[in-house]
Amino acid sequence: MADFSVFCVLLSGVSLFIYSPPPHLIFSQTITGHAYPEFVKIVEVGPRDGLQNEKEIVPTGVKIQLIDMLSGTGLSVIEATSFVSSKWVPQMADHTDVLRGIQKASNVQYPVLTPNLQGFQDAVAAGATEVAVFGSASETFSKKNINCSVDESMLRFEEVINAAKKRQIPVRGYVSCALGCPHEGHIEPSKVAEVAKRLYEMGCYEISLGDTIGIGTPGSMLKMLQRVMKDVPINALAVHCHDTYGQALPNILTALQMGVSVVDSAVAGLGGCPYAQGSSGNVSTEDVLYMLHGMGIETGVNIAKVIEAGSFICSALSRKTNSKVAQARSTACCDASL
């Protein structure tokens, strides 16, 4: 059980949450008085989660070039593709060609999503060295997203994880709808904790808690993490925020204050969810990096190169970037040329 003290004090009528961080994490102090991680690992999910909902099929070569560009930014984890049925997610039908076509950097992991044992076997045959399973804290969302109940999904994931253990392949776990569901609305933190705990105990080395529809606030993020951290160690947790309500960065900041040091994001803010209509993209990698670097938190990632990769994929998709940082820098460059 993961536990550390969290208590509330009143200072001039303002409530402040103060906590004692776990000893295995190294923190740096900031001017806010909160303790933050000195280093944050960014998990780039743009090539998979960011592109899976595109209506027009993105050429395989474009996907490969995007991943190759991201591999040169300093990112240590890039989620490459998803080994799901092309019937359910046509955009990912070229998963084998993508995984085999990218120039794999020695210092980068390229996990792929594998919803079941067949997907895992196909991924391994294509050269996957890390996989991920995608669960949900919502029964309704689970049935619409992966066509089975939460309990049934756990049986599938157990097969995948056991097979991965035999091959010494690490498995990452996702819990969607951690802060709300498009069908059920509010999701109790205890339900999120239950699913996260089951995935962790099965053998997932890291559990990413997803605000699938971007409805969370710092308050709901705080309550959810406090509950989940009773069952899963803080160093095994990550957050995955969508920016539908413009709350992604505040939510990430709250997670950092709680001790989370792994953040999922997507280049250019790509994304959405095919089973959560109306949800906007993931928080942009560029914006997360700008915030973290401005706080003195190291990531090892070159923001300029990420912006370049974002410009490439947005040009390929004929759309404007969702990254506020990229937009601002583009405007500044245009103004400077006048």
Where are the model-predicted features located?
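Catalytic cores and adjacent flexible loops of soluble metabolic enzymes
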Residues: 2-8, 17-338
